[in-house]
């Protein structure tokens, strides 16, 4: 499972949303993270609030916040946009029949008016049915 997400936040704290993963037929989350920043491995608000007091991009092998858009990077200030990713390679999430993930829109300041977009991928080693062969280069040429 891989998750890539984009977030357009207002000028309040947005990092406390809890990530929950439901595996197969679970009614309660099998995996439960305590905050958005924890799930994306950028704890303490994606920066150093003691010295820097601003968001910082970071890129790791399996997680990161690779882009911040907006003129003001100060914590909880302005209309910033963030792009984050998390690959579950070192900590794969195995499931048999189904997988569902939720990400709460929470913070410790005021009501939330954020916009989230996300895309999740999953990989399997064997297809459940034979796949059609890919078209040849000649077949791919537009006519």
What are the functions of these language-model segments?
Residues 2-143:
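Beta-strand-centric surfaces of beta-sandwich/beta-rich domains
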């Amino acid at each position: 499972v891989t998750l890539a997400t984009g977030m357009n936040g207002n000028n309040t704290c947005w990092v406390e949303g809890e990530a929950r993963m439901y595996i197969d037929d679970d009614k309660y989350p099998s995996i439960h993270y305590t905050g958005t920043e924890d799930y994306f491995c950028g704890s303490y608000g994606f920066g150093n609030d003691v010295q820097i007091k601003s968001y910082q991009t970071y890129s790791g092998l399996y997680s990161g916040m690779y882009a911040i858009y907006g003129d003001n990077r100060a914590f909880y200030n302005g209309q910033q946009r963030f792009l984050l990713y998390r690959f579950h390679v070192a900590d794969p999430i195995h499931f048999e029949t189904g997988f569902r993930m939720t990400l709460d829109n929470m913070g410790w300041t005021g009501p939330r008016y954020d916009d989230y977009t996300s895309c999740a991928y999953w990989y399997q080693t064997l297809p459940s049915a034979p796949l059609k062969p890919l078209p040849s280069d000649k077949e791919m040429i537009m006519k």
